[in-house]
Amino acid sequence: MLQARIEEKQKEYELICKLRDSSNDMVQQIETLAAKLETLTDGSEAVATVLNNWPSIFESIQIASQHSGALVRIPPSTSNTNASATEQGDVEEV
């Protein structure tokens, strides 16, 4: 009778060990899933930022296509009045 009880407890112990191992595997899978979800969240934020920029891009394209003039750089000169303008990279509309 005592031997049967010991065998029963050993089987119970083996099952508990399997349950512990399964629980550890589950914890690792959940942690991996959490990391993947974090990556997905970061990617979603990047996509949202890009999508939020499109109206500005379209507006810039529209403004550029409506503008008939061209922008050119002012050539450098030796006079002091033009030197400060060219150092700052000013442009002149033609």
Curated annotation (Swiss-Prot):
It is found in: Nucleus; Cytoplasm, Cytoskeleton, Spindle; Chromosome, Centromere, Kinetochore; Cytoplasm, Cytoskeleton. GO terms for cellular component: condensed chromosome, centromeric region; cytosol; DASH complex; kinetochore; microtubule; mitotic spindle midzone; mitotic spindle pole body; nucleus. Residues 18-38 form a coiled coil. Residues 72-94 are annotated as: Disordered. Keywords: Cell cycle, Cell division, Centromere, Chromosome, Chromosome partition, Coiled coil, Cytoplasm, Cytoskeleton, Kinetochore, Microtubule, Mitosis, Nucleus. Component of the DASH complex that connects microtubules with kinetochores and couples microtubule depolymerisation to chromosome movement; it is involved in retrieving kinetochores to the spindle poles before their re-orientation on the spindle in early mitosis and allows microtubule depolymerization to pull chromosomes apart and resist detachment during anaphase. This is DASH complex subunit dad2. It comes from Schizosaccharomyces pombe (strain 972 / ATCC 24843).
